[in-house]
């Protein structure tokens, strides 16, 4: 049985791709049809590929993998942070800094600085410093937290990356490829799926769609670490996953 149902995907708008003129031809195998100038993603394939991604992430988690969630556009930022934290993992949800992984040692100096500022406050140093200096330290901390707060406690370069919209996160994808880090990603009809190791064809612009898929990846991590009953996931009924392409077409036409 599938970990996600056709109904869930439809309700979240996962099937809506981009305008046909903005498509990447390499996504053709994942496209069902075109409606009113918009590509419609083949959700039967998405159901299967979400299963593949779920199992991939779950198996990696069973081996103790460090997983980095990446999604910096506004539709993804909140879900990426929430689900990464729920799964006990790490995230980048503001802006990907060039060299965040390929210049890991340099980034670690900024992480050290962030921890130093936090320690200063915890130990009461802020109370004896001039107010102007405290203001500057807080501004520095806020900026560091925004960019690297989600990886401050990441013990090493990640073993797996989950990316929302690799088209928007091309620098992150390139760094992952350079370092040989496998990438699982939500890939919309405007993106190139070739650099992605585990493709999830999906609308990556709708908040509900991003939340749904990202939550499934978090569930996979939790199940991998704690066992099958730990993840609060929905196992789709077989009938739901067997909805025909004709039925999907009717639903899409109705929208």
Swiss-Prot record:
Transmembrane segments: none annotated. It comes from the Bacteria. The keyword Ribosomal protein applies. This is Small ribosomal subunit protein uS2. PROSITE patterns: RIBOSOMAL_S2_1 (PS00962). Pfam families: Ribosomal_S2. Belongs to the universal ribosomal protein uS2 family. Keywords: Ribonucleoprotein, Ribosomal protein. Residues 233-255 are annotated as: Disordered. GO terms for molecular function: structural constituent of ribosome. HAMAP family: Ribosomal_uS2_B (MF_00291_B). One of its GO terms (biological process) is translation. It comes from Lactococcus lactis subsp. lactis (strain IL1403).
């Amino acid at each position: 049985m599938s970990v996600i149902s056709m109904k869930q995907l439809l309700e979240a708008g996962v099937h809506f791709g981009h305008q046909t003129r903005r498509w990447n031809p390499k996504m053709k195998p994942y496209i069902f049809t075109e409606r009113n100038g918009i590509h419609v993603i083949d959700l039967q394939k998405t159901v299967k590929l979400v299963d593949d991604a779920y199992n991939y992430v779950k198996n990696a988690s069973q081996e103790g993998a460090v997983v980095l969630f990446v999604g910096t556009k506004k539709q993804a930022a909140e879900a990426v942070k929430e689900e990464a934290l729920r799964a006990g993992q790490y995230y980048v949800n503001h802006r990907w800094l060039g060299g965040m992984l390929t210049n890991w040692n340099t980034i670690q100096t900024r992480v050290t600085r962030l921890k130093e500022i936090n320690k200063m406050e915890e130990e009461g140093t802020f109370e004896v410093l001039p107010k102007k200096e405290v203001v500057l330290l807080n501004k520095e901390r806020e900026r560091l937290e925004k960019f690297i707060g989600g990886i401050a406690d990441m013990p090493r370069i990640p073993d797996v990356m989950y990316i929302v919209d690799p088209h928007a996160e091309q620098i992150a994808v390139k760094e992952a490829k350079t370092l040989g880090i496998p990438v699982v990603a939500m890939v919309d009809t405007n993106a190139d799926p070739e650099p992605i190791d585990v493709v999830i064809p999906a609308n990556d612009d709708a908040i509900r769609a991003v939340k749904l898929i990202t939550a499934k990846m978090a569930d996979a991590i939790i199940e991998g670490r704690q066992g099958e009953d730990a993840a609060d996931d929905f196992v789709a009924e077989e009938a739901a996953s067997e909805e025909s392409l004709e039925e999907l077409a009717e639903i899409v036409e109705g929208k």
